[in-house]
Each structure stands twice: as C-alpha cells, then as structure tokens.
A protein has these predicted regions:
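N-terminal export signals
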Residues: 1-17
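Repeat-based blade/solenoid architectures
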Residues: 38-61, 112-124, 164-176, 225, ...
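Beta-propeller blade termini
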Residues: 59-69, 98, 120-133, 148, ...
Length: 584
C-alpha cells in the first residue's frame, strides 16, 4: 500500500515546555458506583458460596464505549448465568448503561434490545460494517453473539447471518476486532478457553486437579482439553468466513470432544483467555497476543499474506524468565518505557508474579522483577492494563484481583478470596512503585475483580476505571486529581481504513518526550477500553507534534495541539472537531 504524507500546521498554541514532574498530592480513585446508578448491575455467575465448576469462577468483561456517538462513554457489563434452574430461568442478561453526562448512568439494556441470556464471558467493540456506529461482540460458553449497532440506540443480533456464532459448544473467552489483511474491513479473533461439559466434569475433590492446598475446589484448567482459537475474515458484505485453518490461527489445536483427562494429562489446544491485537514488531501489520492459562501464551505474528506464525516462545513472551508457563489471565499493551516498541503486561494466578514483557525490538524479555512487580505475589490478577493515571506522560499499571476458589473464603490461609486492587506508578526509569496505599480506599477495597476497562467517562481529562466484579455489582473508579497535569485525547475516525480506526498508531511528542499508542479492540481480561487515545503531557500546554499512521498506509502530522482538549481526527480530512475537557 502506498503511503501519503500530509503535514497540517495549526495555530492552537506556541510550543510548550514539558515538565514531567510528579504531582504534589497523590491521585486518588473514588468509588462512585452507587452515585452513578450502577449498583443494580449485580453479576451472576453460578452459586456465590458453593461453586462446583470452573465456569462459575471466571466472571465477565466490561466495555467503555460510546455506542450512541454523543461524545460520552457508556458502559456494557457482561453477565453470566447459573446451574440453579430458578436463577437460570429468570434469564439474567448483560447490562448496557447510557452516560447521562452528569456523572450518572441509565440502564438501557431492554430498550437497546440486548436481552440475550447465557454464560457471558468477554466483549470487544468495532464497526465491522463501517456504518459509523460501533458494533458489539460478546463471547459465551456456548453461542457467541454479534450485535449490530443500528444507530438509533438499539442493537440487532446478527450472529447467525454474519457467521460468527460459532459451534455453540465452545467456551469463548477474549476477543478483538482487527484488520489483519488491511483491506479496510474489520476481522474478528476469538480465543477459546477449555472444552467444558458440566455433565462430564468431575466435582470438587474428585481428581488431583480438583484440590487446592488440600481443599476440594472446582476442577481446572489442568486436566481439561484446551480450546482452539478462531479467526474470522470480514468479507465486506456483512458476513465473515472462518479462516482459522488457512491462516494458521487454529494451531495449537484442541480436541473436538469435551473431555476431562484425569490422569496422564498433557496440554492440548490453547487455553486462551485475554487477547489483544497490536503491531508488536513495527512492520505496520497487526499481530495477536493471547494470555493462556497454565500453558505457554501465544504470539501470532502477521506474515502479511493472510497467514500468521505462532512465535511466542522464540520471541520471549510465552513463559516467565525461568522458562515456566504461568496461569495467564489478562493482557495489556502499551509502550511503558517510551522506546517506540509496544510492551505487554499479563496477570497470572496467585503466588505467581504479574509478568511484564519488555519489547526491545528484537523480541521480549521478562522485566517483571527488576521493574518492581514482584512485590505482590499473593493476589490472583484478572483485569489489567497500562494507563497514565497521573498524566505525567508515562504508562502506569492497574490490576483487578480476586481469587477463584470460594472454598478458601473461611479458611485461615495466607491467601484471601476477596482481594484489593493494585496500582503501580511508572517512575519513568523502567521501574514501577506500588502506590495502592495512597490511591484511596476504593483501591484497597476487597472484591472479586474480573474484567476491567479504562476511559475518561466524565470527560475531565484523566482516565477512570470500571471493574466487573464476580457475584456482585461493578466498581466505577473516578480518577480524582490526575488532571492536575495536562493531557490530550485523540479520537481517530477511519475513511480509507476501518471506521473505528483500529490499528491506527499515534505518536505524540512534547519537548524531548515521545509516546506511542494504538487504537485497539479488546484487551485486559475480556474487556474493551475507550477508543480515544489518552496522552498525559505533564505540565505542557501543548503537544508539539502528533503523528498518525493509519492502517491504509496514510501518514499525517499535526503540530502544536493545545493541551486539555479532545481532538477528532478523520483520515484524509484532518481535525474535524475539538473540545476542551469539561465542556459539554
């Protein structure tokens, strides 16, 4: 594809002097769940106190996305079901909350026609038909669902027509839209976890794989056969073709039958959980990373010809520094050390270290311990991502924690069932400091955290967090104080590229400090972040240079963009709208 270069000079402000200094007062996160009206959205995932199966433990994802394009982030919370007939027959659904622009949300699930009930798992967002409204994909144990956004506040289930419902027998986990062939139409990747059948699965304590510290617990994933990942190619007519085999995504392959292997267990399939697509090797093509549970994680490198090669082991992002496959849960992607290469953070099981894979351009290295992430080993992490919570220009890390075994809740162990969240601040020198103790009571509050998403829901210039908690209401964490430093938000709109601009890379430079970010669909644990890219600017009054590389190959440059503004940039048309933070 040919690359055009356009430079636009804008009279926003004079060139700024960045001062990436630490704020004098700590940034705190305030739990505004009740005030925002989100308390009724209680998660259902089997029996809260007597879980018998692994399916009941995993919880669901969450999305920050602007479904009605009014400029304000709405919230979608994935919900599960139950094996209790009374609960199952009540048909619990996922939730969609509309942002009222005043700090509150309204439940619009019914009016939006999002009433599918089942064992919901993950979600991802992308405008697959390029009509200007972002569509929603939800994974399930069972039939997956693609909701077409009708543009009038309602959605239509087009899963069967589009050809992405799946077999109805798989356990869909993380997902992401991506334009892997760069034809302008969003394709879809779905990770499948394990082959699970409650009629065949043993109960707690019935196998060596069903005990934890000698306590009978639900079985898995060890002993279960892993699932097979799926890649759907968008035909451009509203339908998708399953190209998993032809593209190489179906490897490693799991068995077709839903079996539990009680002895002589060997990993088979992927055991895929969190998934994220981004350009890890800076060749202009999206690759796919999958966090895998108790098996080597996967990195599918895009070969530019419609196929992928799985290279995680030689690339250095499959195992930990000791060559051990950890129990990967969620995955976040960003350039935390500002060297121009996208890095990966992955949550793991309790008594394992959250893994930080530093991308050095020739592959990845496990930088977890020297970066300071080894201080918290007793937590079981799920949702995770990089975000700049204090607007100092460096990507920090947030982790939503919570154990999976309800059976340990009343035991006097070194571990707890409900767990606090963790916030790491990036020191700008390759190391992180745990600042959870000073980040507010809401961070320290103990929950069963699962999926989490990041975005500026109140449009005040700092990044907020929403967490989908197992067996309870979500937690909406408002960032209070991050905007004492300045920032800009960049919303990209594709024309030659896909309309959601997924895969667009943006580079922002202030003074001698540069940051990169990509528009991504799906990351964290089964979740979707705000498509608008956030760049903290410290004390700068403007971003000196903003460079965009679109999936189409077009490159555009803008100069002197005022801080504390949202800029909407449309491919080939430049800045089509701007708005100061705090305005409506």
């Amino acid at each position: 594809m040919g690359a055009a270069v356009g430079t636009v000079l804008l009279p926003w402000r004079g060139r700024a002097r960045p001062l990436f200094a630490e704020a004098s007062r700590p940034v705190v996160f305030t739990d505004v769940t009740a005030a925002a009206g989100l308390l009724p959205a209680t998660n259902v995932s089997g029996s809260p106190d007597d879980k018998q199966f692994i399916l009941e433990e995993m919880g669901g994802g969450v999305a920050f996305f602007d479904y009605d394009h009014d400029g304000w982030l709405d919230i979608f919370l994935v919900n599960g079901s139950s094996f209790d007939p009374k609960v199952r027959d009540s048909k619990p659904t996922s939730y969609l909350f509309h942002n009222n622009r005043d700090g509150t949300f309204t439940d619009v699930t019914a009016s939006a026609r999002l009433l599918h009930s089942g064992w919901g798992q993950g979600c991802c967002v992308g405008d697959y038909d390029n009509d200007g409204f972002d569509d929603l994909f939800v994974t399930y144990w069972g039939r997956n669902v693609l909701y077409h956004n009708n543009g009038d506040g309602t959605f239509t289930d087009v899963s069967d027509k589009a050809g992405v419902a799946g077999s109805g027998t798989c356990w869909g986990a993380g997902c992401c839209f991506l334009d892997y062939d760069r034809d302008g139409h969003l394709d879809l990747f779905v990770a499948n976890y394990v082959n699970f059948d409650p009629a065949k699965a043993p109960r707690p304590g019935q196998s060596a794989y069903c005990r934890y510290n000698a306590i009978p617990v639900p079985c898995g994933p060890l002993g279960f056969a892993g699932g097979t990942n799926i890649l759907y190619r968008n035909r451009g007519d509203g339908t998708f073709a399953d190209v998993s085999e032809a593209s190489g995504i179906a490897r490693p392959r799991g068995p077709s039958s839903m079996v539990f292997v009680s002895s002589n267990w060997q990993p088979s399939g992927s055991y895929g959980m969190g998934a994220a697509a981004a350009d890890f090797d800076n060749d202009g093509w999206p690759d796919i990373y999958v966090a895998c549970d108790s098996a080597p994680s996967l990195l599918y490198r895009n070969s530019h010809d419609g196929t992928f090669r799985e290279i995680a082991v030689p690339a250095g992002c499959a195992l930990d520094e000791n060559g051990v496959a950890l129990a990967g849960m969620g995955a976040g992607v960003a350039d935390y050390d500002a060297d121009g290469w996208l890095d990966i953070v992955r949550t793991n099981f309790s008594e394992q270290v959250t893994t930080l894979y530093r991308n050095h351009g020739g592959g990845f290295e496990d930088a977890s311990i020297r970066a300071g992430l080894g201080v918290n080993r007793k937590y079981l992490g799920f949702g995770v991502d990089f975000f700049d919570f204090d607007n100092d220009g460096w990507k920090d890390i947030f982790i939503a924690n919570g154990h999976v075994y309800a059976q340990i809740a009343n035991r006097k162990l070194h571990l707890t069932y409900r767990q606090p969240k963790v916030l790491y601040r990036n020191a700008g020198n390759g190391r992180f400091a745990d600042v959870s103790a000073t980040a507010g009571a809401a961070i320290r509050a103990e929950n069963l955290g699962r999926g989490c998403a990041f975005g500026d829901f109140d449009n005040d210039g700092d990044v907020d967090v929403v967490v989908n908690n197992l067996d309870g209401p979500p937690t909406l964490l408002r960032n209070d104080g991050g905007n004492r430093n300045t920032a800009i938000l960049i919303k990209c709109v594709g024309t030659r590229s896909n309309r959601s601009a997924i895969g667009t890379r943006v580079k922002v430079t202030s003074g001698n400090h540069s940051q990169i970010a990509e528009v991504m669909s799906g990351s964290s644990y089964y979740s979707q972040n705000d498509f608008r890219l956030h760049f903290g600017l410290g004390r700068s009054t403007a971003a000196d240079i903003v460079e965009l590389a679109w999936p189409s190959g077009l490159k555009e440059t803008f100069r002197d963009l005022a801080a504390n503004h949202l800029f909407v940039i449309e491919e080939t048309k430049g800045i089509v709208n701007s708005r100061r933070f705090g305005s409506r």
